[in-house]
Amino acid sequence: MSVHESSNEINDEPMDTDSNIPESSGNDPSMEVDDEPESSDAADSFKRFERLLQKTENFSHCLSSGDAKLATGAPVDTKKRGRPSKKNGIDGDHRHRKTEQEEDEEMVADAIKSDDLVIFDKSPFYIENGEMRDYQVRGLNWLASLQHNKINGILADEMGLGKTLQTISMIGYMKHYKNKASPHLVIVPKSTLQNWANEFKKWCPSINAVVLIGDEAARNQVLRDVILPQKFDVCCTTYEMMLKVKTQLKKLNWRYIIIDEAHRIKNEKSKLSETVRELNSENRLLITGTPLQNNLHELWALLNFLLPDIFTSSDDFDSWFSNDAMSGNTDLVQRLHKVLQPFLLRRIKSDVEKSLLPKKEVKVYVGLSKMQREWYTKVLMKDIDIINGAGKVEKARLMNILMHLRKCVNHPYLFDGAEPGPPFTTDQHLVDNSGKMVVLDKLLMKFKEQGSRVLIFSQFSRMLDLLEDFCWWRHYEYCRLDGSTPHEDRSNAIEAYNAPDSKKFIFMLTTRAGGLGINLATADVVIIYDSDWNPQSDLQAMDRAHRIGQKKQVRVFRLITENTVDERIIEKAEAKLRLDNIVIQQGRMSEAQKTLGKGDMISMIRHGAEQVFAAKDSTISDDDIDTILEKAEVKTAELNEKMGKIDENNLRNMTFEDNAKFTVYQFEGENYKAKQADGMGHFWIEPPKRERKANYQVDLYYKEAMRAGNPTEKQSKAPRPKLPQVFDFQFYPRRLFELLDKEIYHYRKTIGYVAERPKDVPPKEAEKRQAEEQKLINNARPLTDKEQEEKAELLTQSVTDWTKREFQQFVRGNEKYGREDLESIAKEMERPLEEIQSYAKVFWERIEELQDSEKVLSQIEKGEARIQRKYAVKKALDAKIAKYKAPFQQLRISYGTNKGKTYTEEEDRFLVCETHRLGHDKENVFEELRQSVRMAPQFRFDWFLKSRTAMELQRRCNTLITLIEREMGEVVESKPVIVTAADKKKSVAKDLSKSSGTPTAKKVKATPK
């Protein structure tokens, strides 16, 4: 065994460091860069970026130039003996020429230094039952170099390259070479927990791994007898269990915290992300095969968990990696790639695993059965207004339509009531009523003859129910795993399928539950029954079989229903996957589209709708399976060729032709993107004609015959009065409503209308009111000519011609600014001040005439109360801040008994002073406060405060302001003068007492019966 230089060995895989970086003698890369406070000014963003690059380059330098020794067998005792050597000079200062004495002392220090980095050139002695592959040994060396330099990282090898084994070997290295056996914490998905325990026993039996799972009694026993006394090396648990026992786990100081499938913490605000950040640990390691699933912010969340002092601001990170900043800037792209190199190791199978044959994917296009076509049409017809662009487009409604269409193309029996019965039978109709099932049946027969074993993935657990019935009918032995499968049953099913000479032919799984961390390499065929929205999930599913240990070529068959939503989902996923290849494999970290927009969903729904409506019969092919697969391979090659021609910009815009002729907005030769602003545009799908049978329309015949045989003469009635469109907020003269009431009563008299009895009052009172109403009808008379002229004149005397929307603007203006600030209301409404003043005078005099006067008045008074409260808070804050010359350093808060343990006094002082500086009455003040907290240099390592939301900061500030008001002992009076509802009612009642006649109508428009 020959001695290797550590820098050459480590640089082989994970990073390309610059050999010209100045030499460093320390192992702490953070000492290489002055940790000067980061400015909160946006203008300093570039400087912060330069600092980040400098820090990461120094990390990379430490990884490549650290001291190393070759591992030649079992470790020796390397404890330091004697006194430690003294160091002269300033730590980290290597810019000046050394004196001879300094150089001698440094050489002596290097000679007696024992904490060397161990470099492996073959599988370590503590790994049993097999040998690690070369690239896995290099991965172990990379992990060891991270630990040696006190740096956390992400092991992001492609799925199936043995990330679990590399991690286990790293923990073995900690035990056998670093004498740091425990405790280590491994947090994994529930589906892979038992697999991790088995892998520890298989590869490194010297490590004592304990599994923490079970009910409360079982958990408490493990915690009491094993975890808290630290009688273990590694604790393996699940995400859910981690949240349940977080209090006990916080009591330990962990050597390593390792999170498998680390994209589970891509949302830094999730409960799991917050909890794992609160654990104490020396090192952290994230394991994921898909470090970038949707956008760069998720990658920042992972890096922030590993290195919160380096990756502090998500806003800065997002802006540096934005599309605009990176477009056409090759130098910036290369430097950004350098940022990630020290922390992220990413390798793909084609580069490192030559013995594993590449998987072959074929897209198999199928038709619709007659029943599928009928149900697909029903779903489209139910929401035809959405499809034709005439209805209200809501994202939740669109997603619901998409999900129903996906159920149609999978199997119509997913809808309740679709399956014929009772009695319900399991026979040929289960296959014939679904195009995918017809092809699946042919495929499975072929694979059974070939001796292959099959994995079937679907999004729908109820689809697995149908597949179970199908397997029972065809006498196929199978295993099943979905999100509701108990942990013990999962382990038993995987072991039964992977057992030597297993007779299990099919393993059916839901994509999300079975696509993570499960080794099913004994299967060589993967069937994607329906595709996931996220193409990474399908890749993870395929790699359950396409992984180390696979001896055959893995074939993947993706079932797609032609001219349906399936095709659009696949095209969207393909484009997203191509973009991911550009981003990850080339080191390009620009942001990809995260979620489906409304336009994408509408396009998916519309795709193929006319073909579905036009045809009536089944379009399932009768070809044999070999012919179907030949056509599928040709079509797959064509699609791959088309996608390969698309450049990155078109991928981001979801354009599927390099001449931009066809986009997701393209349908039947027209582009509806340009017509989106025109409402319906010219888009219209003609629904299928409804076919009616005339055999049962006897009732209609007799109805027409009776109408023809008994002609009735039309009664002469008074013409229906033409009532004007009047609104209560326009404040017409009261006399107008009296005349309108007379007109209505006379019309009711002419048609013989009988007054209805009120239902919401006691019987006697109801009878009395009915009699009074009927008396008014009986005594009614038509309007005289003079009254008609008077009515016409009164219709011209409205206070305003405002619409309902403008009136609501006026009410909101009073609520926002107060009834006295008419100038601000006028600016808000963009109306002349004189007009607002004139209307406001009438409004407050006659507000009781409004139909919902109490609601309007209450709304305004609540707004004025908020104004008064803001004024009181401002006055209290002004008085408190004025007591100190330097309030950010000197301000004291009298907590009394309300101190609490969540926020420190320094944090509270900053919140109060910064809120006062920004202005408590300012809109979005707490969002600005949140940004100030994140930019404040004194809180750069205060993860708790930096992770608070604007709402949480608002609640804390409200508590502090209450304490300050109590401390100041003042009752602050507000400037606005509030007129109460009671006072206004008295004023209106006084005006009404002067008028007489029929009570005025409050309805917007009187409608005679």
From Swiss-Prot:
A Pfam family assignment: Helicase_C
Name of the protein this chain belongs to: Chromatin-remodeling complex ATPase chain isw-1
Bias kind Acidic residues: ranges: 31-41
CC annotations in GO: chromatin; nucleus
Annotated localization: Nucleus
PROSITE patterns tied to this protein: HELICASE_ATP_BIND_1, HELICASE_CTER, SANT
InterPro entries: Helicase_ATP-bd, Helicase_C-like, Homeodomain-like_sf, Isw1/2_DEXHc, ISWI_HAND-dom, ISWI_HAND-dom_sf, P-loop_NTPase, SANT/Myb
Organism whose genome encodes this protein: Caenorhabditis elegans
